[in-house]
Amino acid sequence: MSRRVVITGLGCVTPLGRSLSESWGNLLSSKNGLTPITSLPNYNEDYKLREKSIPSTITVGKIPENFQNENSAINKLLFTSQDERRTSSFIKLALRTTYEALHNAGLLNPNDITINTSLCNLDHFGCLIGSGIGSIQDIYQTSLQFHNDNKRINPYFVPKILTNMAAGNVSIKFNLRGLSHSVSTACATGNNSIGDAFNFIRLGMQDICVAGASETSLHPLSLAGFIRAKSITTNGISRPFDTQRSGFVLGEGCGMIVMESLEHAQKRNANIISELVGYGLSSDACHITSPPADGNGAKRAIEMALKMARLEPTDVDYVNAHATSTLLGDKAECLAVASALLPGRSKSKPLYISSNKGAIGHLLGAAGAVESIFTICSLKDDKMPHTLNLDNVLTLENNEADKLHFIRDKPIVGANPKYALCNSFGFGGVNTSLLFKKWEGS
């Protein structure tokens, strides 16, 4: 069995906004979602004393303080007093964003968080939500208390930190009784969650799923760790593909997608947004934090997605790149994209490429989920977003970069892209590519 899989609902909270419409609108409007670390409310208390490890010049991609739904009645259902005690921030963010995706998909009963069971069988409704780190805040704070004060541990400490508890809490809150599944593949987590849901539906194991990832890992310890690993830029500017790029900006956020078989979506007369047609993945088997210089692993993931979709390289119109603004990573990805997608392409069929991370930073585990949503919106709205802070494009051997159409200054509107690729790569050599198709009817 191999069924077609379509996208029917989207939800996200990002440094650009607390909803899909706000985030997408601000991305297209060249808004910068990055914040100087010195402007954080807890800067003096948590960061200033650690300036040797965390320079005051860095920026972060902070989500809005109040990311909850504007409807207070819905908030009371989503976040009970028990939830406040039992759940950590990445779980609460997942609950909030899942509500938006389910509402966007037209699955919820009016003014409620319950799913209309006349539209779907909850026994076949899967929940696939991952996180790269989980709750570093709870681990850090509980460790301090236990070590310094010998205080009793919160009985919910373990359920608050496990990365699968976003999926667990979402499935409980919305009564999703299909499979509960969670991956943690560093910065590829979101793409893997969506890709796995694609396969579960495609193979007939589930009829419908909510899939994505949540990350709220802005914390002195995580920042200090990434700075020590020389991953983060200390000049505060995320510059994907630029010759002056010097590392990523750490961000947080969440993205959720409702996916279902085409038959299931048509049966309930759903509003179909896009179709997922390919999923590729590979391992670099090279280094724990760096890709091979030639981007071979990323290339193989792209080629696998194309093969699954039964498409030619020239069919792809747009690449939403992982491009985190690191020296080695951006170049390796460009080489992979050029090698996999440029052969046979005529000058009349440009390959557009951009990165969202100039505007939102690197959302770690949630990056692929949020960027997949932006990729889907690019196809739906015929607007391919540009890369913020891209002034001087990197160079590649044999002038391959000249053959890629880097989107700068403003979005590309009216090019009518039909197929778009979203890449996400992670520490440990994880490579993932999702291939989306513009929905033009069955």
Swiss-Prot record:
Protein name listed in UniProt = 3-oxoacyl-[acyl-carrier-protein] synthase homolog
Location of this chain's protein in the cell: Mitochondrion
Record function comment: Possibly involved in the synthesis of a specialized molecule, probably related to a fatty acid, which is essential for mitochondrial respiration. Is essential for oxygen uptake and the presence of cytochromes A and B.
Which gene does this sequence derive from? CEM1
CC annotations in GO: mitochondrion
Report the source organism.
Answer: Saccharomyces cerevisiae (strain ATCC 204508 / S288c) (Baker's yeast)
Classification from the root reads: Eukaryota, Fungi, Dikarya, Ascomycota, Saccharomycotina
SUPFAM superfamilies per UniProt: Thiolase-like
Q: Where, if anywhere, are coiled coils annotated?
A: none
Please list the reactions this protein catalyses: a fatty acyl-[ACP] + malonyl-[ACP] + H(+) = a 3-oxoacyl-[ACP] + holo-[ACP] + CO2
Sorted keywords for this record are: Fatty acid biosynthesis, Fatty acid metabolism, Lipid biosynthesis, Lipid metabolism, Mitochondrion, Transferase
